[in-house]
Amino acid sequence: MKRCFAKLSALLLLALTLPLTAQDLASFEKRVTMKTLPNGLTVIILRRPEAPVFSFFTMVDTGSAQDPLSKTGLAHMMEHMAFKGTSDIGTTDYAEEKVALAKVEETYAAYEAERIKRVGRDPQKLAQLQKEWQDAIAAADKFVVKNQFGEIVESHGGVGMNAFTTYDETGYMYSMPSNMIELWAAIESDRFANPVMRDFYKERNVVMEERRMRTDSSPTGRLVEQFLGTAFDANPYHRPTIGYASDLQAFSATDALNFFHQYYLPSNMVIALVGDLDPDQLMPIIERYFGQIPAKPKPTELTTVEPPQNSVREVKLNDPAQPFYVEGYHRPSYLDPDDAVYDAITDILSNGRTSRMYRALVRDQKIAAAAAGFSGFPGTKYQ
């Protein structure tokens, strides 16, 4: 959570109209209101009344590093499912839909148990189980109101609705008119309190296609995946955020809901809001809506430490594509005193056309079309 607060504070600083060096830091701090609710949710508000709008950013302190074994891609899948609605949003009759979704899970479990058999799998039985599963999906689909969550946001002036998943965290964001703040609190608290895994297997197919496009069919994507798999042994950064194809094909809506209940907790989340907002008026609204989410202890941090690397590791792909080169060095986590040093080194070496890498490789030697570097790839939470 300390890392999340640092990132969110940086976001708030960037929201100011003048460069940070021109600001009175003490004055800035007076404009920031921060409170932790009784259930553990941390809320940060920066009042910026120049326009009657606000933006928010919700950070969940979990990412693909928390993906369970044999269920890689689950954190990213949960990000997709967060837009599918709740028990109130996205359904014509949730009581009936809930029964139908339970049938989907029941038939999928039977189908998957037969599919993964190593010995004695019955093709005819598998085909019948698959049909029963698909029929159950079709029955549940009758209750779905497609994209209702997004339509509510957009029809009330919301823009920029987006989300992302990294190894370390998951983020959600969009902007709305300031007079829609209570609507925002209602729907955002609802999606983190009452998620429904509707259209799960259809969305899983979307993610599988995303993997095929960005990794399996992309020379660069395949190289980066193998690069990380070679660079790390024990650290969960060696697994792809989008997940392995075989895992995507296997995990269930029940798995996703279990992941949600384990990691999407108030104590594991921070919400930052910037805009034409009065903290004294807004905080009671947030407490009324988000405070209803039950409190649970913050999840236990991963403790696995990457063993020292004592020799060079290389991976090479022979592909009919433009040459692409990646080189990496292990670094400590963000808790290390030298964390800022790595950012400074990266800035000097690879930030823009005046950086040393760009000048040497692109401008002077003309051996590269582009050159870039990152101090926090693939993550900085674990080492």
Show the residue positions of the predicted features.
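Positively charged n-region of N-terminal signal peptides that target proteins for export
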Residues: 1-7
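Boundary at the C-terminal end of the N-terminal hydrophobic targeting segment
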Residues: 20-22, 27
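Active-site His/Glu-centered metal-binding helix of metallohydrolases
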Residues: 74-82, 345
